[in-house]
Amino acid sequence: MNRKLKKILISNDDGIQAEGIQTLTKKLREYGHDVYVVAPSEDSSGMSHGITLKMPLRYKEFELDGAFFGYMINGKPADCVKLARWEIYKDIEFDLMISGINRGANLGADLFYSGTFGAAAEATLLNIKSISISLCEPFGELENYDFVANFITKFLQSIDNIE
């Protein structure tokens, strides 16, 4: 099978400790993609496309299961994308940016408030192709992040050229 592995920037608005970003990152890495994670240190839901102006942005390494997972920053989702592009990974030319997997729906007018969508929009402004992914299970069922992560991995398999 001919597949093009991609350099993928991952962020979210639920924070680096959220199950959605961790599940997606693990799946993409298992498949062989180069995945670079920069996410808020805490839940930043509802931050839209906001940026941090009144305090210095700081980032530090985040470990998961005893291994380097990515960087967490004390800013908003759009800050994560900016900092990844212009500082942390300034020498990397990303093929794609994925924001998510978000916990909860982002439908209709929700997009105006969504930090998940805001991070993807920032990537687009920085000339990085982007996707934002949200998951809402009806009737209070448990979120199935594995299903969505598998779907995204297969979706990326199906496209050889994301230009």
What residue ranges belong to the model's regions?
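Alpha-helix C-terminal capping segments
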Residues: 84-91, 120-129
